[in-house]
């Protein structure tokens, strides 16, 4: 691994924590300042006393080792580290690849036996960033209310024909799964009880979450079913992106980090207190050589073992730039990396060295979410009741224009008028994620209801479709929240991380209730996929071919000219009209064919006319070409 070699590190320092063969199992735990380490072997994943305890021996670089003879498959293990005269408590270690129920004990399994049929020929799909269209989904939300689901709320739901057909019909090319590693907040022993969590509370970073498996008591099941899910999606041409949360752990004192290497993996402030840049009680120290190497090995493990196509990095702004660049270097080029270019609080590390959105220009091949585009379309994150462009409020054009070009430098974007960022922060347009809503904050329907008092269903649909037109015609990487294609709401809940299924589940009945919404999303995605002008992928090409038109308030208009990106259409005009009245936009006189108009999409053409003025109906988008 070039990135690790450059730092003088050992490629398998963490990844080789447990090595199983039928003849014996080798254990190797990093515990650099330990006085002693005991290895406990258990017959079960929970309860009972150890069937064997082995005193591990200290080797080089603070790695403690032990070898236990015989076939241990099906057994469980923990480590117990002694440091400064104190036993730190049992832990499955730092890099468990399989665990018992609730992740308290590591499990010894034959990883090769978890590979589903055809796994050896499965690969990450290798899509270019320009071909990625992201669908963000929570494992439980997506399937728990689907009547014909055989495995509601489980990894295997995404192998079922109805699920695959929905995603393929919509046209998305990648599914982004909210945290699916082993997290702490759901009790896997009592899944009969109502429980819900998004999963941003890491326990074991390198094991799939047990509550999404059909049997969390059998360690190999969650591993195999995650792989089955990945393979089914790959077979359908859908890439798999995992949401990863390395910026904090569920807590400090009971974490696997703290029970092996106290205070090594966490930052402290000048007062010696644990820093909380995550807003969750702690923040990890990615700049520390051990945490840096841990992250690199963990990313690479998921990419290699589970054939993942990409990663969404939670609170990426907590991590340092150097570590993010090393992760980028360690992974294949077409494994997508994007993240939140901010933190949730002040970090105990210089801000100029953090992977913030403003520093994305220093991280080639890594993207960040554009809150400029999001908030200029729907309103600020800080106030759910404030509206913006969708309510035809003035002053938001430049921010939307920045989002349209992918937050790159463009001669027609005045960044002094852009919200949050006063200069371009992306070198290439594919370093910007274009979106209007995600799992965080109000979903788009709820935001429209909160920010535009008295809004009716027809107007809500018009504005919903208008907002997504900006997203899917952006030169950035388009990103949508699952269920928005069926007009999803969350009953106005702003932060639904522990809300019940009644709030978070997808409203599948809406597919029949609002078929025009799905058809429009489907059409926009098909338009983007069919026409390279909307995904040029190069800042130089965007500056050459994308030209904004002079228009009044409540409007954004641009032209993709001269067969941009080799497109079959010579010039494409996109007009977004948030006003409550129709507007006219001047264009060169020519014969134009409309493909998006008045809430409908037809790539073969809706209407053709020769004109020098485009009439754009109220609260809608118009796309024409010549």
What are these regions (language model features)?
Residues 3-22, 58-136, 141-152:
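The feature marks proteins involved in alpha-glucan
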Residues 23-27:
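Structural beta-strand segments of beta-rich domains
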Residues 31, 73-77, 606-626:
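C-terminal beta-strand-rich structural cap/linker in extracellular carbohydrate-active enzymes
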Residues 31-36, 579-580, 589-591:
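Short proline/glycine-enriched turn/loop motifs at strand-loop junctions of beta-rich domains
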Residues 100-102, 106-109, 113, 328-487, ...:
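Conserved alpha/beta catalytic core and glycan-binding cleft of carbohydrate-active enzymes
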Residues 138-306, 316-332, 336-339, 347-348, ...:
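Substrate-binding/active-site clefts of carbohydrate-active enzymes
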Residues 416-421, 476-493, 503-572:
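Glycan-recognition and catalytic regions of carbohydrate-active enzymes
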Residues 460, 473, 506, 524-526, ...:
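C-terminal accessory region downstream of the catalytic core in glycan-modifying enzymes
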């Amino acid at each position: 691994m070039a990135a690790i070699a450059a730092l003088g590190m050992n490629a398998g320092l963490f990844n080789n924590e447990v090595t199983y063969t039928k003849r014996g199992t080798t254990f190797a735990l990093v515990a650099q300042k330990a006085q002693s380490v005991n290895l406990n072997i258990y017959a079960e994943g929970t309860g009972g006393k150890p069937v064997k305890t082995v005193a591990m021996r200290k080797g080089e670089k603070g790695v403690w080792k032990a070898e236990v003879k015989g076939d241990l498959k099906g057994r469980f293990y923990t480590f117990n580290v002694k440091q400064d005269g104190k036993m730190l408590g049992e832990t499955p270690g730092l890099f468990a690849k399989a665990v018992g129920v609730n992740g308290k004990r590591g499990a010894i399994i034959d990883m090769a036996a978890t590979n589903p049929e055809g796994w050896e020929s499965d690969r990450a799909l290798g899509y270019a960033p320009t071909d990625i269209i992201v669908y963000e989904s929570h494992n439980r939300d997506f399937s728990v209310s689907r009547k014909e689901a055989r495995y509601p709320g489980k990894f295997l739901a995404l192998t079922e024909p109805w699920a695959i057909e929905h995603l393929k019909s919509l046209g998305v090319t990648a599914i982004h799964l909210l945290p699916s590693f082993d997290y702490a907040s759901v009790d896997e022993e009592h899944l009969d009880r109502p429980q819900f969590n998004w999963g941003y509370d890491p326990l074991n970073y390198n094991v799939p979450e047990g509550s999404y498996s059909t049997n969390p008591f059998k360690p190999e099941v969650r591993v195999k079913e995650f792989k089955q899910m990945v393979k089914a999606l790959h077979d359908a041409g859908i890439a798999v992106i995992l949401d990863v949360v390395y910026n904090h752990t569920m807590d400090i004192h009971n974490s696997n980090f703290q029970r092996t290497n106290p205070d090594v993996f966490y930052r402290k402030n000048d007062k010696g207190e644990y820093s909380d840049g995550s807003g969750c009680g702690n923040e990890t120290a990615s700049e520390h050589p051990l945490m840096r190497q841990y992250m690199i090995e963990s990313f690479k493990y998921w990419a290699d073992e589970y054939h993942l196509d990409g990663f969404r990095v939670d609170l990426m702004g907590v991590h340092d730039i150097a570590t993010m660049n090393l992760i980028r270097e360690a992974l294949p080029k077409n494994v997508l990396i994007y993240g939140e270019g901010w933190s949730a609080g002040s970090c105990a590390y210089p801000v100029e060295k953090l992977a913030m959105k403003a520093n994305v220009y220093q991280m080639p091949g890594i993207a960040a979410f554009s809150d400029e585009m999001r908030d200029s379309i729907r309103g600020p994150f800080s106030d759910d009741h404030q509206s913006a462009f969708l309510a035809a409020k003035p002053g938001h054009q430049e921010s939307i224009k920045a989002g349209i070009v992918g937050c790159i430098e463009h001669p027609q974007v005045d960044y002094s008028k852009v919200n949050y960022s006063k200069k371009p922060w992306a070198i290439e347009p594919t370093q910007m994620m274009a979106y209007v809503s995600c799992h965080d904050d109000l979903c788009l329907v709820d935001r429209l209801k909160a920010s535009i008092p008295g809004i009716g269903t027809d107007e809500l649909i018009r504005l919903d479709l208008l907002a997504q037109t900006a997203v899917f015609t952006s030169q950035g990487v388009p990103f949508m929240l699952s269920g928005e294609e069926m007009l999803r709401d969350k009953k106005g809940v702003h932060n639904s991380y522990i809300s019940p299924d009644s709030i978070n589940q997808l409203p599948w009945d809406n597919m029949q209730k609002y078929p025009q919404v799905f058809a429009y999303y489907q059409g926009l995605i098909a338009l983007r996929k069919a026409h390279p002008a909307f995904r040029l992928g190069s800042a130089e090409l965007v500056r050459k071919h994308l030209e904004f038109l002079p228009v009044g308030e409540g409007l954004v208009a641009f032209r993709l000219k001269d067969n941009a990106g080799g497109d079959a259409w010579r010039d494409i005009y996109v007009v977004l009209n948030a006003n409550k009245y129709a507007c006219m936009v001047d264009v060169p006189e020519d014969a134009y064919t409309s493909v998006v108009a008045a809430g409908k999409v037809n790539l073969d053409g809706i209407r053709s006319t020769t004109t020098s003025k485009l009439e754009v109906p109220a609260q809608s988008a118009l796309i024409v070409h010549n």
